[in-house]
Amino acid sequence: MKKPSLKYCGIHSLEDLKVTARSKADYLGFIFAESKRSVDPADVKRWCGETDTPGKKLVGVFVNENMSRMAEIVKDAGLDVIQLHGDETAADIKRLKSMTDCEIWKALPHGNDTVQSMASFAPYIDGYVIDSSVKGMRGGTGVSFSWDSVPLYIDAAQREGKRLFIAGGVNPDTIADLLKRRPPGIDLASGIEERGRKSEKLISLLEERMFEHVFISE
């Protein structure tokens, strides 16, 4: 199988950024919303100025943020992607699209109507992140959903020509099971952390197991 796009999210220190910058990830994510991994835009701008991230795109994660403020943050910090985890409507995203050149991804919870929701946002976004549905949480659940549904989401994203990332409960011990469903993208945060910090050891282990599966599948 083709190597999935890999996104490491929840970077919340300069050291986190340096560790993940040395990884094989394609995307690195910063959370600009209430979270234990929340970061200040000024810090992100400074960290990015001090760290080379060759071949990696930078993602800003937002929850119900003002559209103008989002566009301002990503431009100032030099980010490439806006990832929306709130109650944004299609009309909101259409407006945001007119304010930025960044890609826009919409995070959606796994559920019975997820494919329908994907179709409703398709005209205005560039990708989807599908995560577990956990009451009171906006992503970053650390809990997996039934990955038997992943092929449905892959089909829906391919029909619309959009990126797709699967999130929730992905770590070195579970990645082989997820890869059996051939996801085009994988998004994780806590699965590569030890004591709240990004772990070079866990990143290396996850990537080793991912590439082993990709090689065997081919």
Curated annotation (Swiss-Prot):
E.C. code: 5.3.1.24
Keywords carried by this UniProt record: Amino-acid biosynthesis, Aromatic amino acid biosynthesis, Isomerase, Tryptophan biosynthesis
Any single GO BP term: L-tryptophan biosynthetic process
Catalysed reactions, as listed in the record: N-(5-phospho-beta-D-ribosyl)anthranilate = 1-(2-carboxyphenylamino)-1-deoxy-D-ribulose 5-phosphate
Single annotated GO MF: phosphoribosylanthranilate isomerase activity
Superkingdom, taxonomy of origin: Bacteria
Gene3D superfamilies: Aldolase class I (3.20.20.70)
Pathway: Amino-acid biosynthesis; L-tryptophan biosynthesis; L-tryptophan from chorismate: step 3/5
Disulfide topology: none
InterPro entries the UniProt entry points to: Aldolase_TIM, PRAI_dom, RibuloseP-bd_barrel, TrpF_fam
Record family assignment: Belongs to the TrpF family.
Full protein name: N-(5'-phosphoribosyl)anthranilate isomerase
Source organism: Bacillus licheniformis (strain ATCC 14580 / DSM 13 / JCM 2505 / CCUG 7422 / NBRC 12200 / NCIMB 9375 / NCTC 10341 / NRRL NRS-1264 / Gibson 46)
The encoding gene: trpF
